[in-house]
Amino acid sequence: MAIAIGLDFGSDSVRALAVECASGAELATSVEWYPRWREGQYCDGANNRFRHHPRDYIESMEAALKSVLASLSAEQRADVVGIGVDSTGSTPAPVDAEGNVLALREEFADNPNAMFVLWKDHTAVEEAEAITRLCHQPGKEDYSRYIGGIYSSEWFWAKILHVTREDSAVAQAAASWVELCDWVPALLSGTTRPQDLRRGRCSAGHKSLWHESWGGLPPASFFDELDPIINQHLAWPLFTDTWTADVPVGTLSAEWAQRLGLSQSVAISGGAFDCHMGAVGAGAQPNALVKVIGTSTCDILIADKESVGERTVKGICGQVDGSVVPHFIGMEAGQSAFGDIYAWFGRILGWPLEQLAQQQPALREQIKASQKQLLPALTEAWANNPSLEHLPVVLDWFNGRRTPNANQRLKGVITDLNLATDAPALFGGLIAATAFGARAIMECFTEQGIPVNNVMALGGIARKNQVIMQACCDVLNRPLQIVASDQCCALGAAIFAAVAAGVYDDIPAAQQRMASQVETTLQPRPAQAQRFEQLYQRYQQWSVSAEQHYLPSAAKAEKAPQSQAALTH
């Protein structure tokens, strides 16, 4: 009985999942935390710098795979036919001529610029804005039109340009740059050299300005005009061809076969971003909006090519042929913070308890237990009295805004407070804010002629916090399907591995047998939906007003009168 393994590289940990290909049964799973990341190494949150050491990925992946394989019988281990990989993104790293991430070399071992630049690293805001301006020059090709019209600081070229400008040693040593979701399959298959490495359609199309209509990447002249420093250090084009994730990049290398105790015949499928594979694991069909909810959200929608036609959807994070399911257009959107907003509020409320624990060491364990109950208690308190009449209006931009219209300069805003606002009400305002952000994304599609036939949610928050999900359901004012599996991203990676290994002919056939089921479907409550509608309109008004205060300084000075007028809304 064929078994596929999915690897899901998240922000904090990597998950390995073994799945029986015939039934979709989840046989074994393991989660390994990144040790250096957990200690806060190589990060500077105050300056929005978040880096992952490649050894965190390698060590945690090996431990997770060995743990899963140890849970299988000898017969089952012999039945492993493929390994699939998904990761956060855009999370690129500089590599040398052999495809080694520079931080694996002694001279760069502790240099954050030689590591993977995590998706939520926002150090490249100015570089991203420069790319957007260049794309929009009159009379020139707009290379941003298939990625929503705005290039983000979270993406490939902005990060490359920022590091290249900042660190000449890394710039000199880098032969290329590679996304994490492409590098791990190459590592497992022994194909890391830039000329051998297969670039995934998903990462290239959504984050690297790659599109078939202009022959791949933008021309060298585009990068020269952006900043000649890129072409001075990197050979153009960095790559030309891309592959969908169902195409194998190779088989398990002799080194990794020995380390894992598996056959070298195990197929290694192409890589893609976590949420794209999560949508596949959830069994998503065309025009279903799939919300992968965690610290942030990634929203995925696939559409038939003919229905999309020549239309380009503005304000999203890209529309790419084959980025999710081959032969369909994959569209990506998302919220830069979701669960992170609740965690922030928990830290705010927990600060006095931390001080008390320092003063009273004997009470430390009791206080720690109380801290863990803060958010569940707030959720319950607001659910028991979900009054919306005096609910604070909050803008969910605590980590910038990804969609609609990416802008990482934005900050969170809390309005409509009074002396009667208590902790449950403020927490309710945060819940509503994340739901409003979800609706803004849905409307970004529907208002541009892309139908949303149904909405699905997956992830830990989706399954474990019905209060938050019901608020989303009421704000969206449509049914909300909760997907059963907690491991849809890893499951999606396993589905791609099964197709790469030849167990199934294509992704839809594999989904029929392996994808997760819908656990429950929430229905909107008409009265709450009507009340939320009024708050959503206020959320939109504040969004227009507040955004004026986070314009780049030059533009802000130019538009100051407009900013003041906006505040009178």
Swiss-Prot record:
A Pfam family it matches: FGGY_C
Ranges that cross the membrane: none
UniProt enzyme class: transferase
HAMAP family: Ribulokinase
GO molecular function, one term: ribulokinase activity
Name of this chain's protein: Ribulokinase
Enzyme Commission no: 2.7.1.16
SUPFAM superfamilies to which the protein is assigned, alphabetical: Actin-like ATPase domain
One CC-aspect GO term: cytoplasm
Family to which this protein belongs: Belongs to the ribulokinase family.
InterPro entries: ATPase_NBD (IPR043129), FGGY_C (IPR018485), Ribulokinase (IPR005929)
Keywords, alphabetical: Arabinose catabolism, ATP-binding, Carbohydrate metabolism, Kinase, Nucleotide-binding, Transferase
GO biological process, one term: L-arabinose catabolic process to xylulose 5-phosphate
Catalytic activity: D-ribulose + ATP = D-ribulose 5-phosphate + ADP + H(+); L-ribulose + ATP = L-ribulose 5-phosphate + ADP + H(+)
Disulfide bonds: none
Annotated metabolic or biological route of this protein: Carbohydrate degradation; L-arabinose degradation via L-ribulose; D-xylulose 5-phosphate from L-arabinose (bacterial route): step 2/3
Lineage: superkingdom: Bacteria
CDD domains given in the database record: ASKHA_NBD_FGGY_L-RBK
